[in-house]
From Swiss-Prot:
This is Telomeric repeat-binding factor 2-interacting protein 1. One of its GO terms (biological process) is positive regulation of NF-kappaB transcription factor activity. The gene is terf2ip. Belongs to the RAP1 family. Residues 431-444 have a biased composition (Acidic residues). Residues 174-518 are annotated as: Disordered. InterPro entries: BRCT_dom, BRCT_dom_sf, Homeodomain-like_sf, Rap1_C, Rap1_C_sf, TE2IP/Rap1, TERF2IP_Myb. Gene3D superfamilies: 1.10.10.2170, BRCT domain, Homeodomain-like. Acts both as a regulator of telomere function and as a transcription regulator. Involved in the regulation of telomere length and protection as a component of the shelterin complex (telosome). Does not bind DNA directly: recruited to telomeric double-stranded 5'-TTAGGG-3' repeats via its interaction with terf2. Independently of its function in telomeres, also acts as a transcription regulator: recruited to extratelomeric 5'-TTAGGG-3' sites via its association with terf2 or other factors, and regulates gene expression. PROSITE patterns: BRCT (PS50172). One of its GO terms (cellular component) is cytoplasm. Pfam families: BRCT_2 (PF16589), Myb_Rap1 (PF08914), Rap1_C (PF11626). Keywords: Activator, Chromosome, Nucleus, Telomere, Transcription, Transcription regulation. The keyword Chloroplast does not apply. It comes from Danio rerio (Zebrafish).
């Protein structure tokens, strides 16, 4: 409030020049500027933001020495504005001028003032020389001079002292004569150093070796501490056969090798020829011991094999994998194919009711399953040794892979069959299998599992597909048959791949049995024909036709209208949604009433019967 009162008392022409223009002032930003701004503006003056030419520079007298130290400009004290406002008249600004410029002063005046550069006295030079005399190598660095400044050797800065020494005092220090002080030398001690002690010990050992041929036993005891302990492999190895009297044991040979290594390092050159002569003997002994160990390992493996064969006599007939792999594969494949065709034809002659049943399980079975059943087929085909081979656990494990199954099936036979050729042996096996099949069918005709296909598959099987099916199944069977020849006893039913199409058609016509499932399949065929006809009439795909049937609740006429003319909500009514179907199947009475009010009772019953039909 006081500042506003003062500003109101100031005349508006206080800071106008004789021409009637407002005076311009410049003050550095700060509290002083905030104080003077209302006074200058109320008096008619202007306060510039930047320093402009012709503007009066105002400055606080307390800040004049710090701000305008090196400038020669003319500054007016802020007291000028305050005095003009107090007296309410324009005063002369030159009376308040503050001129701070570079002034020329003498050395003596600077010394009296206590500021500026001072000269060096003789005492200061002597102190510098005395301090730097012992540190001449560090004189060109900075650390020594900084330390002198810390210790206050002189009142000058460390840069000044360094400059003084390098320019004026360094020559004086070089001209000074240096006095050599007598250095006290320590008396020489003739005690032996640890390195010399080692050399003396080595020389003494060499001399002892040269003088007398020491026995190998004490050397082995000395080097025993250096040698590493025996490996666990040596400790766990089985006991070897007794060696000859002239040959040392393996442990002694190893020790002798360790001894030779130590002697080569420690003994002088005169001992080297003798050691080189002993080295071949040790190596020969070591190689002979290795050969003996291999022989013992072989004998142990043969003994273990013989013991296994004694425990499992059937395993003797199983050959090695290398012998099995060398046998020809193509002949084996041909024999397997002929065996399967002959056995199937004989079965079909005996049981004609099973000809029309397609064997889809054999098509969908994996190669691994066919490999597992192939092992059982050889055992059922009349080979007694094959039956015994499955009881052997080692034989079953060996037959896990497809290659091993082929080896065991082809080569696990009697000694008489080995003499015969492959084709003759296969024919003999087929005869035995036919005999076994006849006996088994007469005793237990119901034991053979018959895999009946689903009704949907039977109904969808048209004559064209029945003709194509044997060809595709035959190709698939030829691919899987060489790897895994399956027996007829283990298969779910006879495959239609081998049966001709004429047999299929004739047997299917002569052996038709009327069952509820077959009637259902007939209904399914009729529905299928109707859907195909609807697709032809409307020229729509199966997806569109199926959607229309779902909308029409299975009504073919309404579905045809939907496909041809489209759906109209006003004429056809609301459509059933998935949520409506779920509520209908839930059979909640309250929700059923809502559905009946929405669709009508007839439509609800029709939809319910449509959703309840289970077509397989």
């Amino acid at each position: 409030m006081s500042k506003k009162k003062e500003a109101s008392k100031i005349s508006p022409v206080l800071f106008l020049d004789p021409g009637g223009q407002s005076m311009r002032f410049y003050v550095r930003p700060g509290p002083t500027k905030m104080q003077l701004h209302p006074l200058i503006t109320s008096g008619g003056g202007n306060l510039c933001r930047n320093q402009e030419p012709g503007a009066i520079l105002l400055i606080d007298p307390t800040d004049a020495t710090n701000v305008t130290q090196n400038t020669g400009q003319k500054y007016i004290s802020t007291k000028y504005i305050l005095d003009c406002v107090e007296q309410n008249q324009q005063l002369d600004p030159n009376d308040y001028a503050i001129i701070i410029g570079p002034s020329v002063q003498t050395r003596m005046a600077l010394r009296n003032q206590g500021s500026g550069r001072l000269g060096y006295s003789s005492e200061e030079d002597a102190a510098i020389l005395k301090f730097i005399e012992k540190r001449q190598q560090d004189a060109k660095g900075n650390l020594v001079w900084k330390e002198m400044e810390k210790r206050h050797v002189t009142e000058h800065s460390w840069q000044s002292m360094k400059d003084r020494f390098l320019k004026h005092l360094q020559q004086k220090l070089a001209d000074k004569p240096t006095k050599k002080s007598p250095i006290k030398r320590k008396p020489l001690s003739f005690t032996q150093s640890p390195l010399r002690k080692k050399k003396v010990v080595e020389i003494s050992e060499d001399e002892s070796v040269q003088k007398g041929d020491c026995p190998e036993a004490p050397m082995a005891t000395e080097t025993g501490s250096i040698n590493p302990p025996a490996s666990p492999e040596r400790a766990s190895s089985p006991p070897e056969e007794p060696q000859a009297a002239g040959q040392p044991s393996q442990a002694s040979s190893n020790d002798s090798q360790d001894e030779t290594c130590v002697l080569v390092i420690e003994t002088p050159e005169s001992e080297n020829p003798r050691l080189d002569e002993d080295a071949p003997d040790a190596s020969n002994e070591h190689s002979s011991l290795k050969k003996k160990r291999r022989k013992t390992c072989k004998t142990s493996t043969t003994d273990s094999r013989s013991s296994r064969l004694e425990e499992d006599p059937v395993g003797q007939d199983i050959p090695d994998e290398s012998n099995a792999q060398s046998s020809p594969k193509k002949k084996r494949q041909k024999a397997c194919k002929t065996s399967t065709t002959d056995s199937r034809s004989s079965r079909l002659e005996e049981n004609p009711d099973r000809r029309d049943i397609p064997d889809e399980s054999t098509e969908q079975s994996s190669p691994n399953k066919s490999q597992m059943t192939s092992k059982i087929s050889t055992s059922d085909s009349g080979n007694p040794i094959g039956d015994q081979g499955c009881d052997n656990p080692h034989g079953c494990n060996a037959n896990s892979s497809p290659s091993k199954t082929r080896q065991t099936n082809s080569e696990a036979s009697t000694p008489d069959s080995k003499k015969l050729g492959i084709l003759a042996k296969a024919a003999k096996e087929f005869e035995d299998s036919d005999v076994m099949d006849d006996s088994e069918e007469c005793e237990n005709p119901c034991e053979v599992p018959i895999a009946e296909p689903s009704d949907a598959q039977e109904s969808s099987a048209t004559p064209a597909t029945l003709v194509r099916e044997p060809e595709s199944q035959a190709e698939h069977h030829e691919e899987t048959q060489p790897d895994s020849p399956m027996s007829e006893e283990e298969r779910p039913g006879p495959s239609s791949a081998v049966v001709p199409p004429s047999l299929n058609s004739s047997t299917s016509c002569s052996h038709i049995r009327e069952t509820p499932e077959e009637t259902l399949s007939r209904d399914l065929l009729e529905v299928k024909e109707q859907v195909i006809n609807l697709m032809r009439e409307t020229k729509k795909d199966l997806v569109e036709v199926t959607k229309a049937l779902l909308k029409a609740s299975g009504d073919l006429k309404r579905a045809q209208v939907f496909l041809l003319n489209g759906y109209d909500h006003e004429t056809h009514g609301p459509l059933w949604t998935r949520l409506d179907d779920e509520t209908l199947l839930a059979a909640d009475p309250y929700e059923l009433e809502q559905l009946q009010s929405k669709f009508g009772e007839e439509e609800v019953t029709r939809r319910k019967s449509f959703l309840a039909t289970d077509v397989k």
